[in-house]
From Swiss-Prot:
Subunit structure: Monomer. Binds 30S ribosomal subunits, but not 50S ribosomal subunits or 70S ribosomes.
Protein's name in the database: Ribosome-binding factor A
GO cellular component terms given for this protein: cytosol
Single biological process term from Gene Ontology: maturation of SSU-rRNA
Organism: Opitutus terrae (strain DSM 11246 / JCM 15787 / PB90-1)
Primary location: cytoplasm
């Protein structure tokens, strides 16, 4: 990935997060943009979002994001000057849930493992 693409990823992610936080406070509660990947030609961007809540609530928030994709893109375009502003595709990011599950399994293993006897110091 080029340095320019990385900078565009970070810039759009930051601006989009800011727009959701300030302009759409009630609608965007529990939504976090975890990653943004812009295509090399800068025409398309995949926006990975983490949504806190039940599967039903996640689906509802994801539908809201997809329904307002054009409006959100317009708002980002007002803040960022690029030759091409990518179209946003919103994708649910399951990595926070997977991470939480891994931590839970590690905690269970920790509890089941007997403590090691401490070495005697002479």
């Amino acid at each position: 990935m080029s340095n320019r693409t990385l900078r565009v990823n970070e810039l759009i992610q930051r601006e989009l997060s800011e727009i959701l936080r300030k302009r759409y406070q009630s609608e965007a509660t529990a939504i976090t943009i975890t990653e943004l990947r812009v295509a090399p030609d800068l025409r398309d961007a995949r926006v990975f979002v983490s949504i806190v809540g039940s599967a039903e609530e996640q689906d509802e928030k994801l539908r809201w994001l997809r329904a307002h994709a054009g409006e959100l893109r317009y708002e980002v375009g007002r803040r960022i000057v690029l030759k091409y502003l990518p179209k946003f595709e919103y994708v649910l990011d399951h990595s926070p849930e997977k991470s939480a599950r891994i931590l839970q399994v590690l905690d269970e293993i920790d509890r089941q493992t007997p403590p090691r006897p401490e070495a005697e110091n002479d």
